[in-house]
Amino acid sequence: MFKKHTISLLIIFLLASAVLAKPIEAHTVSPVNPNAQQTTKTVMNWLAHLPNRTENRVLSGAFGGYSHDTFSMAEADRIRSATGQSPAIYGCDYARGWLETANIEDSIDVSCNGDLMSYWKNGGIPQISLHLANPAFQSGHFKTPITNDQYKKILDSSTVEGKRLNAMLSKIADGLQELENQGVPVLFRPLHEMNGEWFWWGLTSYNQKDNERISLYKQLYKKIYHYMTDTRGLDHLIWVYSPDANRDFKTDFYPGASYVDIVGLDAYFQDAYSINGYDQLTALNKPFAFTEVGPQTANGSFDYSLFINAIKQKYPKTIYFLAWNDEWSAAVNKGASALYHDSWTLNKGEIWNGDSLTPIVE
């Protein structure tokens, strides 16, 4: 009897050991586009796992300017001169929505693509944003408010306004296609700061909720998503939703989990420990980033070392930040070296290990 009992215990022990020894199944985070290119899938999954690391877990980022007008590698060069490091993410804006042009699509420029391709091939990740011209006008007017009736016309492809929007989207898609052809994944951030009252696609009054406007915004976002994804077949985009931290209704405009890969905040602040919206955005269960950041008072006195410390203490799910250029740049403020050399910060050249991304931590 004792012998049988011992054998039974031994069998149970061996079975339990086998179960415990079985490798834990990896948790994969996929892009919302089911047809995403394999490289884009790999990058998305890698980004989503960054918060599991103990260090090298927050990608640095910087805005390089507006394509054709101000875009160059100068911002990356300034940061490298100040810190000895280069930003992991480098941003370009295709849309110069303030320009008065004969045709609204002429405000779109994609000439930054060459530099973005090189940045990717040399170990960085490109980000593209859009300060779109206002289709309610012939061109320009990206900060001119529109009524909800005008908004509806923009959504209607049969109207003059709708055709203007489509002309811009077509040219943007052409530029994105160039990057896809080279296998370059893109952090794509359209229609940002929609909860603010300064861009035509957003609210019209300070912190005044407009449910119809919110619905129209969601329709516009989805229209752009379906055009890029279904009509144009662009499978290299990682879709980023980025409301403004200093306004209410941060998640009201959220178009849905099927349309967004990363959520973030555009945050201009004096106190890095008092940024609003982190809990609201992370509750959407998407990877979180500071999609645009800078000091509220841009006089060179801001200390960016406080920002990375705040990320570590208050916003630990952050996977990247993208600091604006010019007077908001880390290079012309304090603490740039501390920001770029912090143990949590991941810079260009630290993303890849040979031909593979650095290992994922489950």
From Swiss-Prot:
GO-annotated cellular components: extracellular region
InterPro entries, A to Z: GH26_dom, Glyco_hydro_26, Glycoside_hydrolase_SF, MANB/E
PROSITE patterns the record matches: GH26
Coiled-coil annotated spans: none
Subcellular location: Secreted
Site entry (Plays an important role in maintaining the position of the catalytic nucleophile), positions: H192
Catalytic residues in the record: E193, E292
Top-level EC class as recorded in UniProt: hydrolase
Residue ranges of every copy of the GH26 domain listed in the record: 38-349
Binding-site positions, substrate: H131, W198, Y268, W324, N325
Function per UniProt: Involved in the degradation of glucomannan. Catalyzes the endo hydrolysis of beta-1,4-linked mannan, galactomannan and glucomannan.
Name by which UniProt lists this protein: Mannan endo-1,4-beta-mannosidase
